[in-house]
Design a protein with these regions (language model features):
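A transmembrane-helix-recognition feature enriched in membrane-embedded lipid enzymes
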Residues: 421-428, 548-595
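N-terminal nucleotide/polyanion-binding subdomain common to many enzyme families
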Residues: 354-435, 440-441
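Carbohydrate transferase catalytic cores enriched for Leloir-type hexosyltransferases
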Residues: 1-355
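Conserved beta-alpha
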Residues: 423-498, 502
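C-terminal amphipathic helix plus adjacent low-complexity
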Residues: 346, 350-365, 588-595
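Venus flytrap/periplasmic-binding-protein-like
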Residues: 417-420, 529-545
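Acceptor-binding helix/loop patch of EC 2.4 sugar-transfer enzymes
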Residues: 101-125, 424-436, 541-559
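Proline-aspartate-enriched helix->loop->beta-strand connector
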Residues: 80, 503-508, 513
Length: 595
């Protein structure tokens, strides 16, 4: 895959986001993808082995505006399959001409109100949400961030996927254990909550205060002077160590030396160092909010970050009980084992491969015919019953009112977009359908694959004629049998028996919407290893009963006009009334979603 990665801002490689960018880029590179990175000056050397779109590092205001309104017009989007914005809670584009995944790490500004100046708070609370919503897919790095995206930025739930961060395992080193409590974070007040940690240390029993040192590596950030001033005036100031920024190479020794890792941040999108400490076997205590409570559940001692007393009690409980230390150490190692940067990269790639739009709560694939065929091939190889559907504007109009049909579509293994109506509706809602993946165009492609196919549906005689014409294609597929959709030639039981005896791979069901989806759904357990696909009027076209539109009409996406010409009485209501109704419903849906 040719992937465009926005790697700004990189924060000189000294923040949690810079770790995320560095490790995801490395994992995608190891998977063999062709990467082009957008970088500012501070990231150019780090990523010089890649093709770069390099931009000058500017102050925050100009960087935000340049990324929004200039950079998107500098990019040759046609060179790439898709784009990942690795820090979309910091920088976004005003337009996304190709499928774009926007990764949002946290919305801490809603939980730490004085985190930034007024301009940045306006940018984060008003500008970013508008442009992030335009991205085709949004990734939250934790369920906590996902909840915030829904509550504060009003992102539709169906647009959000949770792809957890990984972490880089800390190598084990032989070193002597020290009586030290560790907290690795940039020194940022009030967000990182160093002040309450210092106060909590002061509340520890005297013997613990004398025995332990509180070590706090991290670069100075906004508000650091407040933390340093308090520490300098504390009666425990000799027990506090601020080491400054620590390179990754020095982390193994720090973790190995520590008796306790404490993470009192007021809010975190993820909290990488918590997993690093768990992997290293260090007993952990952390805040009970945001992603920290999510990661620390049942594996760390939790506390309220706003209460120095609770933080002190948590530290005391762990430091005073060696058995509890061993228990937390074992649980932490087990939790950390489930996270890796390779899994993060795979999760991002899976979002692209299965990219979907949602209209009226119905999910459908927005990729290409080739990718749709690959999905079908994977299902056939699995040798178990699967349900695939096609949807167009008419289908979505039915799903708008028919909850049972809508649920069936949600339960399908795959749903493909057929027709210009679904494409227009998706575009109105901020999605991009790349190709018209319709059953009629797909049929000859399936016929050229080594499948065993059964034709089921249509009026008496239609399936038989379609079978003759399908066999005349002389493709690799074996068209093994057929039955009409009125059960005149064969009963349901006879059809089920025939499907089993003929070892059918793909069952094409042509009964019309929603009848065919309801039939497949209610009989899925009787279909053995068949992949059942609802194909509407396909057999009418294959049999020659109804002609297809000329190629020029198909290329212009107006095949529906030809169908209306051929069957005006049957299709007048569907197209002349149904299409405007569909557009109106999509418009109302968009208004409700953006409230």
């Amino acid at each position: 895959m040719k992937i465009l990665l926005s790697a700004i801002p990189f924060d000189n490689g000294k923040s949690g986001i810079s770790v995320y960018i560095r490790e995801v880029v490395k994992a995608l590179e190891e998977q063999g993808h062709s990467l082009t990175l957008i970088v500012e000056d501070d990231g150019a050397k780090e990523f010089e082995r890649f093709e770069l779109i390099r931009i000058k590092k500017r102050n925050a205001l100009f960087s935000m505006l340049y990324s929004l309104f200039v950079l998107p017009f500098r990019i040759n989007w046609k060179k790439f399959d898709f784009c990942i914005m690795l820090a979309a809670n910091r920088r976004v584009f005003c337009r996304y001409p190709i499928f774009t995944i926007a990764v949002v790490h946290d919305l801490s500004q809603y939980h730490v109100p004085v985190k930034y100046d007024k301009f940045r708070m306006f940018y984060i609370k008003k500008v970013l949400p508008y442009y992030v919503r335009k991205a085709q897919s949004i990734v939250a790095i934790s369920n906590s961030t996902r909840s915030d995206l829904i509550e504060y930025w009003h992102i539709p739930e169906e647009k959000i996927s949770v792809v957890y961060n990984g972490f880089t395992p800390i190598p084990a080193v032989e070193t002597q254990k020290k009586k030290q409590i560790l907290y690795i974070s940039r020194i940022e007040h009030p967000g990182k909550n160093h002040l309450n940690l210092l106060k909590a240390f002061e509340l520890l029993p005297e013997e613990l205060k004398k025995e332990y040192t509180l070590v706090m590596p991290g670069a100075a950030w906004n508000g650091a002077e407040t933390v340093f001033e308090y520490a300098g005036n504390s009666p425990c100031k000799e027990q506090f160590q601020f080491t400054g920024f620590v390179d990754f190479a020095k982390l193994p020794e720090l973790y190995s030396q520590s008796s306790l890792y404490v993470f009192p941040s007021r809010f975190e999108g993820f909290g990488l160092s918590l997993l690093e400490a768990m992997h290293a076997g260090v007993p952990c205590a952390c805040s009970n909010n945001s992603s920290l409570g999510e990661l620390g559940q049942d594996t760390a001692e939790l506390f309220s970050p706003s209460s120095p007393q609770e933080i002190a009690e948590a530290m005391k409980k762990i430091l005073s009980d060696s058995n509890y230390q061993q228990e937390l150490s074992a649980k932490g190692r087990a939790k950390a084992a489930g996270f890796s940067w390779q899994n993060t990269a795979k999760g991002l790639m899976e979002i692209y491969r299965s990219r979907r739009a949602f209209t009226f709560g119905v999910p459908f694939f927005t990729g290409t015919m080739e990718e749709a065929l690959f999905q079908i091939d994977c299902m056939v190889r699995e040798k178990r019953a699967r349900h695939i559907a096609f949807i167009n504007a008419h289908c979505l109009n039915i799903a708008y009112k028919n909850r049972e049909y809508k649920q069936i579509l949600n339960d399908c293994a795959a749903v493909f977009a057929d027709g210009i109506g679904a494409k227009i509706g998706a575009k109105m809602l901020g999605y991009k359908v790349e190709e018209n993946v319709n059953g009629t165009d797909m049929f000859p492609l399936l016929a050229d694959k080594p499948y065993r196919i059964y034709l089921f549906g249509g009026a008496p005689g239609v399936a038989e004629k379609a079978l003759v014409n399908a066999r005349a294609l002389n493709g690799k597929a074996v068209f093994a049998g057929c039955a009409d959709g009125f059960f005149k030639s064969k009963s349901e039981e006879e059809i089920f028996a025939e499907l089993a005896s003929l070892e059918i791979d793909i069952l094409l069901v042509a009964m019309g919407v929603p009848k065919q989806e309801e039939w497949i759904n209610s009989h899925l357990d009787r279909l053995g290893s068949c992949t059942a696909i609802g194909v509407g009027g396909l057999l009418d076209f294959v049999s020659g009963r109804i002609p297809r539109a000329p190629m020029w009409m198909r290329k212009l996406n107006i095949e529906w006009c030809f169908r209306l010409y051929c069957e005006p009485s049957r299709l007048f209501r569907r197209y002349i009334i149904g299409n405007p109704l569909f557009i109106g419903r999509v418009f109302l849906s968009k208004l409700r979603r953006n409230k």
